[in-house]
């Protein structure tokens, strides 16, 4: 059936996945590929762009295609030439988004050769992938790689801008966004880039938001009990002017996948030597670096808390560029002072392994969506410290759902001032010493487990999507 091998048969629908750049986007696509191939009887091809922006992306793709073959295959998606100087100083991941978007016409021959039953595109590429799929009669679905709340904003934001334009409010900036049927997203929580109408990300976000109503369906890595208001509003279509919206498939939390057995990492050996629920795990994701002065305040706060901690430090946007000296980053003597009760690394870690470990009692997180769904899956309390993008929208969910707490006054990218060591230490002590925090997070974990169980809402939702792919295969 597919051009890259003879194992794909008409008995199994063939789903082509089109991820975009960044681990926050690629990880859920890898998990979806395995879930579809191993749990729901699909053949899967992943349109992979090389080279990747980061080393972590390259490692993940290599592991996926080795371990999940032959049910999961690579489709080499070669990009058209792209002049990055058109967007001086732009984020390297946003540049890759744009380069991939402009190469969308090249996706057509891949779909033709693969004889795809369906295309699942990243939301970042939706507005350019949808016409290509439509031309070929291939059903086009979107995998939304953030929360249902953020999907609501994406779907509603074009109408919000249109209403402002009609009222003559162009140029006054984005304010509070009241999404019908959902809730208010305060101005301070709207992703920073969306306040600039000329920003590359804003242009992509609006174009993709406008096209959502034309897609065949939207998969979201969340579960009904985690975001009941947003999921209900999306399914009822109350967030759109027309009152219509495609089917929404809540398929999360998509579970992490270990592709191969490896030697136990040194950070895991360290974790195993710590008492139950005694360790604070600190990670701000793979996408952004914290400014050095704030990094040192965080270091001092962790030290002052007196708690054990495992900290993954990042100093650059792209991991290939991360050559900083750890001791120099965190201040003279810090590593020596916390030796024994802390493990600090700049290396890549398997976060899902850490969050599953019984010694972890708190997760200080930037609120990237993959991180939050992993914390929810394992019932680990979260201290939310959003830094940019969708992360304040996600942090609000941490507080609403009972997964943890969000100190709304703590600074994020572009804001003046520092979150002090005293604030950090106080919050850590409070959350680590309060049993109700762990109990509420554990309830979220129970709800997540129920959702992905065979009769659960997320399992059934993914099966409904697969059945649509089977039906398309028969036509």
Curated annotation (Swiss-Prot):
One of its GO terms (molecular function) is flavanone 7-O-beta-glucosyltransferase activity. It comes from the Eukaryota. Keywords: Glycosyltransferase, Transferase. It is an enzyme of class 2 (transferase). Its EC number is 2.4.1.-. UDP-alpha-D-glucose binds at residues 286, 348-349, 366-374, 388-391. Bifunctional glycosyltransferase that can produce both C- and O-glycosidated flavonoids. Converts 2-hydroxynaringenin to isovitexin. Converts eriodictyol to orientin and isoorientin. Converts naringenin and eriodictyol to naringenin 7-O-glucoside and eriodictyol 7-O-glucoside, respectively. This is UDP-glycosyltransferase 708A6. The lineage of its organism: Eukaryota, Viridiplantae, Streptophyta, Embryophyta, Tracheophyta.
């Amino acid at each position: 059936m597919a051009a890259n091998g003879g194992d794909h048969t008409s008995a199994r629908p063939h789903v082509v996945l089109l991820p975009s750049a960044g681990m926050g986007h690629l990880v859920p696509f890898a998990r979806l590929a395995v879930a579809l191939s191993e749990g729901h009887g699909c053949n899967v091809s992943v349109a992979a762009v090389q080279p990747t922006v980061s080393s972590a992306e390259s490692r993940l793709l290599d592991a996926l295609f080795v371990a999940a073959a032959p049910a999961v295959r690579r489709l080499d998606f070669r990009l058209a030439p792209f002049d990055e100087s058109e967007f001086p100083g732009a984020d390297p991941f946003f540049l890759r988004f744009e380069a991939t978007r402009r190469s969308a016409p090249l996706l057509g021959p891949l779909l033709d050769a693969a004889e795809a039953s369906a295309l699942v595109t990243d939301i970042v590429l939706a507005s350019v992938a949808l016409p290509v799929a439509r031309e070929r009669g291939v059903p086009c679905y979107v995998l939304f790689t953030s929360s249902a709340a953020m999907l609501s904003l994406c779907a509603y934001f074009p109408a919000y801008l249109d209403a402002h334009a009609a009222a003559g409010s162009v140029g006054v900036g984005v304010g509070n966004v009241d999404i019908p049927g959902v809730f208010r997203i305060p101005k301070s929580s709207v992703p920073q880039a969306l306040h600039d109408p000329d920003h590359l990300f804003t242009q992509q976000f609006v174009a993709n938001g406008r096209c959502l109503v034309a897609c065949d369906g939207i998969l979201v890595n969340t579960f009904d009990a985690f975001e009941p208001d947003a999921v209900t509003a999306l399914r009822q279509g109350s967030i759109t002017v027309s009152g219509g919206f495609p089917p929404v498939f809540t398929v999360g939390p998509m579970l992490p996948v270990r592709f191969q057995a490896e030697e136990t990492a040194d950070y895991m050996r360290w974790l195993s030597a710590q008492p139950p629920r005694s360790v604070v795990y600190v990670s701000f994701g793979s996408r952004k670096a914290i400014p050095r002065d704030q990094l040192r305040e965080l270091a001092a706060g962790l030290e002052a808390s007196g708690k054990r901690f495992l900290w993954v430090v990042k100093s650059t946007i792209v991991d290939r560029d991360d050559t900083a000296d750890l001791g120099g980053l965190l201040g003279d003597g810090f590593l020596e002072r916390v030796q024994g009760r802390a493990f600090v690394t700049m290396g890549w870690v398997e976060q899902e392994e850490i969050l599953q470990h019984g010694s972890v009692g708190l997760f200080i997180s930037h609120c990237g969506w993959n991180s939050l769904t992993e914390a929810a899956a394992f019932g680990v309390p979260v201290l939310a410290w959003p830094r940019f993008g969708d992360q304040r929208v996600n942090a609000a969910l941490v507080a609403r759902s009972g997964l943890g707490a969000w100190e709304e006054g703590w600074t994020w990218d572009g804001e003046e001032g520092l979150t002090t060591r005293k604030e950090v230490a106080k919050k850590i002590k409070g959350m680590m010493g309060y049993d109700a925090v762990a109990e509420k997070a554990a309830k979220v974990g129970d709800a997540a487990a129920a959702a992905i169980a065979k009769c659960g809402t997320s399992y059934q939702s993914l099966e409904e999507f697969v059945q649509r792919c089977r039906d398309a295969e028969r036509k």
